[in-house]
Amino acid sequence: MTEWYVDRFVPADSIQQKCFYIEEREQKMKKWIMGSLAILLGVMSISIPFAGIHTAEAKTTEETDKKLNIVTTIFPEYDWTRVILGDRADDVNLTMLLDNGTDLHSFQPAVKDIMKVSSCDLLIYVGGESDQWIEDALESAQNKDMKTINLMEVLGDSIKEEETVEGMQESDHDHDHDHEDEEEKEYDEHVWTSMRNAEVICDAIAETLEEMDPENKEIYQSNAETYKEKLSVLDEEYQETVDSAKQKTLIFADRFPFRYLVDDYGMEYYAAFSGCSAESEASFKTVTFLAGKVDELGVKSVLTMEKSDDRIAQTVIENTKAKDQKILQLNSMQSITSEEIADGATYLSVMEDNLGILKKALN
């Protein structure tokens, strides 16, 4: 990765050229993965008994057959499903694929991941461009009775096209798509950052569980309704916070995966990159634009994503007049680990923490 020095800017042309080579390499890797899926699944069907590949842990065939195998790709799906299952969670093998801190956009499936997807009883996934490998794996799935929940399909017309706001740095990837297919639309995958979307998705999860396990239908319905009430209460707190805020604009010196969140509450934002961008270096133009917006709006903080390098935010601040803004982090839940879950992280707890950050950022 190119180093960023705060005492000078990296020329935009140089950054774009480097990003082009990075994206070209990533595209070749993705093609290799896609080409390997068919061969891999074919080998699996011959060499691995169906009953033994439901989970990564060593379980007897009898134990595995007694339990539903549910695979989720990311943390929000996992946590919603866990809550709706309630006491029934002990009778289900619930797996989260992205549990080691890798985010949705950079995840590359291993053999064990494809095995889990191929043989599970229920698969819950986002369904955006980053999940293309799942669509390919499903075509050769071993369990032909598998049920799936595609979040973007569940939300239908509620999903949003990716947007480039004023001052946002476009990547070579964006330009390539413009030239390849003028009619092709790209949609923002980060649907889980909206608690209103979460309520709709929880209904879909509960309904699917009811179909698969009708004897416990009332449990799933009750758990989903109780959880949705908690989501609704927190949603109202967010709205009240924004309505009473001194200003309603966020300055994001990073990728911006919070489009659904800000749209829910009527906030505005300026960001260095879109939520799905592969960029990691901001151009002189991008940095100076964001610094100018900080000065113009008089905001006291610059935001980044969780586990993000703060170099761009630091450089933006150093180019403002006051040079004393704080750096705050919003958690998009793209890289929650199994260790964090063991320590008590939940979708609601993360969104509550994000509300606290927003209160500081908007006031």
Sequence positions of predicted segments:
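Short helix-onset patch at the extreme N-terminus, typifying the N->h transition
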Residues: 7, 34-37
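Extracytoplasmic metal-acquisition and chelation regions
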Residues: 20-22, 30, 34-35, 42-363
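Short, Lys/Arg-enriched N-terminal segments with co-localized hydrophobic residues
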Residues: 3-28
